[in-house]
Amino acid sequence: LIAVQTQGYAEIDPRALNAQDIAGPEYAPAFSLSRQDASYLKELLCPEDPAVSHPSSVAVELNASSWVERNRPAYNITGYLPGTAASEGDDRMILLSAHYDSYFDGFQDDNCAVSMTFGIIKALIDSGYQPRYTIAVCALAAEEWGVCDSKFDWSTGAWNQVFRVHPEWQGRVIADLNFELPAHAHNTQDAIRSTYESADFLKHFCENITVPKEAYPDGLTVLAPIETWSDDFSIAISGIPSTVNDFSAGPFMETHYHSQYDNEEFYQEAVYRFHHELYTRLLVTLDQLTLPPLDFSRHFLAMKSSVADCLAAQSNAPAEVLEEIPALLESISKVCESADLLYEKIQEINNHTVSADFPIVSGLSSKLLHIFRKMQD
């Protein structure tokens, strides 16, 4: 199989190669060819002028060694900055994550992200800041792909980390800050992408952030929900509220992404510095909270909107189905009201307007994360 990417990816240069996860039989030789080389071979074999003689085949030399092997080990690399609350029996954590497997140089995707987790932790240590919660830093393997005989072959390292290697993180990690391609501005406006439940907290957090114009002229916003592109999705479905710096909408995905042109020549220092500062500040803000700031009403509102859209699109549905829809919408509205009241209580505790003992807080935090997990299920 010879793959030539004509558009959509690797558009930066005719010499660009593009690599993606394999979806095909393991015995089939497969490789990527640049548009430039493909055009040359096509002209040799199929000249535009039919009067020009051409060979029936062309001999080429391929110098490559790349094998897909089953059941090979991969390694997630984890470190910890202990929190002061651990000595009091509070084992809650905040997670910083990025993947270290990459195609070609993988400068933006995702080596800059791994180094940013180091930079954030170094800043905390150098400043003398002592976190309340233990900070876990995880460099993840097998994000690009890693499962044979499956359509769901990417973000494998993250899934294994939270479901198999450290399932006890579920109920303990109050937030995951995941990073992807963080040293490049993918749009004129930056965005933190999160699960529905964290969006309100993040919007209030962003109100106090000054965004440098040289990095993002149109400022900063919050998007929800997360997408399946990156490891924050695998982590979120385990019951850990997750965020990622938004990266999927910009032209970089069509030009440099997964090609040999994702290298240090395409680097924006102002963007990288801002992301260091933004997510360090977010980490410290989360570290000072008593409870995970989860507003479940956002998820139910999205559900209500989805049900209404389905109802509008299926006017020919059976009568018994249509009759049940109003009751369902009413039930969702009542749940939203309860979720609003719960979030108000969470905010009161986090703003220290009401006090709560540690055993009560710890149990409530665990229950909130349990509800979050059920929402993902």
Predicted regions and their residues:
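Mature extracellular/periplasmic domains of secretome proteins
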Residues: 1, 15-22, 158-168, 192-203, ...
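Extracellular/luminal Protease-associated
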Residues: 1-29, 109, 218-221
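Structural recognition of the beta-strand scaffold that forms the well-ordered cores
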Residues: 1-4, 29-33, 76-80, 93-97, ...
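Soluble metallo-hydrolase cores and metallopeptidase-like ectodomains found primarily
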Residues: 19-108, 118-129
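Second-shell loop/turn segments in exported
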Residues: 26-31, 64-67, 100-110, 147-151, ...
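Active-site-adjacent substrate-binding region
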Residues: 72, 174, 181-301, 305-306, ...
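Acidic/histidine-rich catalytic neighborhood of metal-dependent amide-processing enzymes
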Residues: 73-76, 102-197
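Acidic, Ser/Thr-rich low-complexity intrinsically disordered segments
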Residues: 294-376
